Regions:
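A short C-terminal helix-loop "cap" of Rossmann-like NAD(P)-dependent dehydrogenase/epimerase domains
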Residues: 81-84, 136-146
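C-terminal helical subdomain
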Residues: 63, 96, 120, 143-185, ...
Length: 209
């Protein structure tokens, strides 16, 4: 964040794409389960730290996933942020992807009429290194399927680029996209009370780091 802020030019877009997936055992960073910390808090720190450098108009694009459908029934388990209770790798990943969507919706609300937008997306199932923590059999199956059903990295980036640059979505904010089109989320991913609570909990954690 500091290195980017040291530059002179404003930012036309901030694209959040870092992530981890399917870590076999529960691990934590600063007391938060590692998927949730890396995939959500990392982006929260980056975006909130750079908002004062975001141009107007400017855009924030956050990579989520349809895996948000695998999040816990409560959405975000605030009483289990360590992730130790009932840990399951894809459930933890799903919670982090739900957090991406909730964060983006709340950010879009906060940006309001500033001429800045925030949107999120499902990139598709892509042949990248993020699957490296999957069990060996699952990795082998994905390698076999890759030429037939998996997107390339370039194809997976298409919706990110669309949301970051297309005039067609210049006034769209707080939305979820897939394959460059609006897409549906689970009802809990549209819960603005939950989104506001996640923002507050995220701010509290970042203040302690």
């Amino acid at each position: 964040v500091a290195a980017v802020k040291a530059g002179a030019a404003p930012l036309d877009a901030i694209i959040c794409n870092a992530g981890v997936m399917a870590i076999p055992e529960p691990r934590q960073a600063f007391g938060w389960e590692l998927h949730l910390f890396t995939n959500h808090i990392g982006h929260f720190i980056l975006v909130t730290g750079l908002l004062d450098r975001l141009a107007s108009p400017g855009r924030v694009v956050v990579t989520a996933s349809n895996a948000h459908r695998r999040a816990p029934a409560a959405g975000i388990e605030f009483d289990n942020l360590t992730g130790v209770r009932g840990y399951e790798p894809m459930r933890a990943y799903g919670q982090s992807k739900l957090a991406n969507i909730l964060f983006t919706r709340e950010l879009g609300r906060r940006l309001g009429t500033k001429g800045q937008t925030a949107n999120t997306l499902h990139p598709g199932v892509i042949s990248t290194g993020i699957t490296r923590t999957l069990p060996g059999l699952a990795q082998a199956a994905m390698r076999m399927a890759s030429p037939l059903v998996l997107k390339t990295a370039a194809q997976g980036a298409a919706t990110q680029c669309y949301l970051a640059a297309s005039p067609a979505v210049a006034s769209v904010t707080g939305a979820y996209y897939a394959d460059c089109n609006p897409s549906e989320t689970t009802p809990i991913a549209r819960d603005m009370t939950l989104a506001a609570k996640l923002w507050a909990e995220s701010e509290a954690l970042v203040a302690r780091i």
